[in-house]
Amino acid sequence: MKAGTYKVKAKGHGSSFMPMEVTLSDDAIQRIQVDASGETSGIADEVFKRLPAKIVKGQTLNVDTVAGATISSRGVVGGVAEAITLAGGDADEWKQRAKPEIATQAAQVEEYQTDVVVVGAGGAGLAAATRSLQHDKQVVILEKFPQLGGNTTRAGGPMNAADPDWQRDFAALTGEKETLKRLANTPLEQIDPEYRADFERLREQIKEYIASGAQYLFDSNLLHEIQTYLGGKREDLAGHEIHGRYQLVKTLVDNALDSVKWLADLGVKFDQTDVTMPVGALWRRGHKPVEPMGYAFIHVLGDWVTEHGATILTETRAEHLLMENGRVVGVVAHKTDGTKVTVRAKSTFLTAGGFGANTPMVQKYNTYWEHIDDDIATTNSPAITGDGISLGQEAGAELTGMGFIQLMPVSDPVTGELFTGLQTPPGNFIMVNQEGKRFVNEFAERDTLAAAAIAQGGLFYLIADDKIKETAYNTTQESIDAQVEAGTLFKADTLAELAGKVGMDPATLEDTINKYNSYVDAGHDPEFGKSASHLKCEVAPFYATPRKPAIHHTMGGLAIDKHGHVLDKAERVIAGLYSAGENAGGLHAGNRLGGNSLADIFTFGRLAADTAAQENG
């Protein structure tokens, strides 16, 4: 190889491309420097700590990826391989070299006695741990991956909570009042009995708001409740109906704003200048952190539990619950080095997420989709494999809603990631099929969007112009340009040219966009009923982002009550056992609204910790 320092770019997580500098001698890799400033914070931190050193020490590219950060790990290896090729070396030979030797040690045993043990260090687990520490409890956290965060790190960021005093500062958008009118006109007999009184109260709120002529953004806990309930009310393939348990939905919407305030008190900074709406949220009530994505929550909570004395054991997989006389009294786990860990605790929290990264398990339980492909992509962390659900079953926990799987309609068609391309608020979505035609109300629920996309063959495109581009989440112009250069995002000066690049008929795409623009002007979409379109698509350059549904959220899980107790098959509390977040079921029922997951994990994680502290001293 020709000695020198080579500058390359490697694919990171999401839309980022990581600049790298690789210094080579004529026969060795001497140094690897990665500029990860554009990488998704919290997902691949351990990659940049471990992998370059492992490659340099072992003088091989045959290295294992870092658990939970496969894409970034492959990106680092690929970047070094590119540098070797540029230097005239044989990258394939480096990839075929022996793996670095792993030091072995005799099996160890660790034992802990504590007040609280938390299994899974995503948002729900860290919320439970933080709140337990606020109650002066001793806390042990078990996380099977090298770093904290779980799926929460990958979340888009907006957290649903009705906050009418704040929302009054924002103007109502064209069509939002029509959405409220349609909701209020829902026949009462279509509302399940336990929700009817609240629905009638909501009707009166909407009637009063419309009659007042107010032009501000309306919201209330009741609107959030009824949208969550109706948004999750579904039938499976056999015609069995499911909807969210009233007490769980009520607890969520009545406590979500307190969760936002609690997080703010801990140090999470929210952008008060913008009320946002993730895809499939149905309403603008999202509290968006200033920092990008879910890392805004994870680093604050992670730092807080560390600073306040939690014992954090990463790369430690919980394998069994300890049971005594029908009560859960702790966990048995193993570290990746073989060390056996036994934690005895007064309170055990299962917060290990759902099973969206376990395709065979998804296929086993699915009763909602006609077919789940073996090679379907997922938006999930590889950690999300159903571990906490299996642990709960050991204690006799009831499962609920397991057949309902949410597909994220606007995922990367190759990786399943959320934030490649131009991912905007759904008010700015223009979804077109491979013929260049719109095919759905872009404001609809996620399962509706995913089903419509599947009916079109799966692959579709989000069309944007320069103004819509400015509303995209979690990206930069540098990243956009890099994706255009890589051929994963398409850009053109005219719609006709853009159509040619993605294989559409130019006249069809132009006609579609012209009609869409006219609907924005009119405030009414006669084709698909999209009620709130923010921007027209008319300012060059134009973009097409390829999208395809991927597994996103598993609504089912352990049955819980409103206090976070795990319930058995007779709906009795399992003493000492609590759950929250995607590990639990019963809240979202058949479909989860965008932005409700963050409200869920922080609300039920926090409240379950309050319950445990009160019950277990």
Swiss-Prot record:
Pfam families: FAD_binding_2 (PF00890), FMN_bind (PF04205). Its EC number is 1.3.99.33. Signal peptide: none annotated. Disulfide bonds: none annotated. Its cofactor is FAD; FMN. The active site is at residue 446. Binds 1 FAD per subunit. This is Urocanate reductase.
